[in-house]
Amino acid sequence: YHSGYEDKFLRIMEEYKLTSGIVVKGEEGTSHFSLRLGKPSDTERKAINYAQGFRPKDQEKTPFAQDVDPAAFGYTYDQNPRLPEITSQSFAEAGLAALSGQQGPVYDRLILNTALTDHLLGLEPDPDTALQHAQEAIESGRALNRLQTYIAATNQK
């Protein structure tokens, strides 16, 4: 998102009575956490990997706002990795390879994003458990199976 929209997005989520919601200032305008934090947030600007939202706790919505530092979870990259070829085909192939268990930056990105999103939304009690569950979903083949089931269902005429 662009700065200034986070509160608007969160307000819309609350108006729709969602029990949890998150906005992420992701890399290159996406809603995905980068594998590097870069400069932390300050009073003037929000960092890449800044997450803000709310989650349920004790029957109430609890707000949160924080930078997500991948290094705190064991992901240490000097530069944010990029695929050699930037095409939809290369992204799809890399994603399928990662969901098949191929280790590397795309795999790390999937684990980090899935786990931290689940944790921040209150679906997992802590980041370490969330990371473990995300990794188990890929290593067991459950994540790839879900994607393949979705693709098959959407291709039916």
Please annotate each region the language model reported:
Residues 1-157:
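Glycine-rich anion-binding loops and their surrounding alpha/beta cores
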